[in-house]
Amino acid sequence: GWGRTIRTHXSIDLNXGE
């Protein structure tokens, strides 16, 4: 939940995750 979607090593959605 960083407030943004960071795509790295494919695709990692930190909005949902962190």
Curated annotation (Swiss-Prot):
It is found in: Secreted. It comes from Opisthacanthus cayaporum (South American scorpion). This is Venom peptide Ocy6. Expressed by the venom gland. The keyword Secreted applies. Keywords: Secreted. The lineage of its organism: Eukaryota, Metazoa, Ecdysozoa, Arthropoda, Chelicerata. One of its GO terms (cellular component) is extracellular region.
